[in-house]
Amino acid sequence: MILHLRFVCSLKFLFPFFLLFGAMACRTTETERNVFRENPKKNLGTDSKYELEDGLYAVHYGNGRRLELSDESEDGTERKETVFLFYLIKSGNRILLIDSGISSVRTKDRYGLKDWASPSTILEKAGIRGSMVTDIVLTHFSADHAGGLDLFPRARVFINPNDWELLKKTDWFPNLRKILHTKEKDKKLTFVQGSLEVFPDFRILFTGGRTPGHSAVEWLRFPKNRVLFAGDECIFTELCAGGKDPAGLPLYSVKNHREFIQYLELLVEQGTKILTFHDPSLLRPEEEVFPRIYRIP
C-alpha cells in the first residue's frame, strides 16, 4: 500500500507526466541484450529441492488489512483481503527484484503486517542469498516496496530521483541514510526519469500517480507474453482492468493516475498480464515452488 504519503501529498511542486509511449532507450552491453530472454518451452518450475530455476516469481512476505472498496452504483461497502508481494526474475546469474519488501520488524509492526517473514529468509530457502541479487527496480519509496533494500548490498538500484530523495527522509530500516549513501558512492544507483529501456524488451515507465516518482515496469518475456508490474497504481488486477481502483487511497497526481489506468486498460485488451503487489488472486497454490514463492506462468 501507500504507507508513507502524508508529507508527499503536501508537496507543492508538480512533477510533469511523461507519455508512456515515449520510451527512451538505454545502451546496454551485448551480455545484457540477452539477459531476460526466456525460453518459452523450458519448464520454469523447479525440480531441485534447493535451487530456484530461471523464471518469474511472486514472493509473498506478509498479509495486510482488508481494503474498503466503495461503489456508488451499489449499496454497502465491500472489503477485500490484501497481501504484500514483490517479484523476482532469475535468468542465469542475474537475479532482478521488482521492489524489495520490508526487512525491519519495527517497520513491519508499525504498519500492521500479519504473517510476515523477512524477504531474506524466504529467498534463502530457495538458495538465493542477499548478495546474489544483482538488480532491484523500486517502483516507489513506500516502506512495503523499498523497505528491504538493506538486504541486498550488491544490487544496482533503479528508481526515479524524486522518490529516491523521499526515501532518504524515511527510517524504513536501520542505518538507512548510510546504506543509501553507499549505493550512491559505489555507483550502484541508476536514476530513471520518463521511460527507460533497461534491458531489451524490459522498460521502466514513469507513472507519477501514487507518488511523485512512481514507476511501473513493462516486460515482453517472449512473443505474445507481456507483463506489466503496476506498483501501487493498481491494487486489484480485475478492478483496474475495468478502469476502477479502490477509492480513498492517497494520490500525488489524480491526473497521472487516471492516465495510467487508461493505459493499463489498453494493455489488458491487448493480452498483457497485469501484476500488482497486493492482490491475493495472483497467488495460486499449485504454483508455490518454495514456501511463499510462486511461479508466474
Tell where the protein language model's regions lie, with residue ranges.
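N-terminal secretory signal peptides that target proteins for export/translocation
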Residues: 1-9
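C-terminal motif of bacterial Sec signal peptides marking the signal peptidase cleavage site
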Residues: 24-25
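Basic, amphipathic N-terminal segments that precede the first structured/catalytic domain
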Residues: 32-78, 196, 217, 290-292
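Metallo-beta-lactamase
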Residues: 39-47, 103, 117-128, 132, 161-206, 212-288, ...
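Conserved beta-strand hairpin/beta-sheet module of binuclear metal-dependent hydrolase folds
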Residues: 63-121, 216-233
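Divalent metal-coordination and catalytic microenvironments
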Residues: 89, 99, 133, 140, ...
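Active-site HxH/HxHxD metal-binding segment of metal-dependent hydrolases
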Residues: 95, 102-187, 236, 295
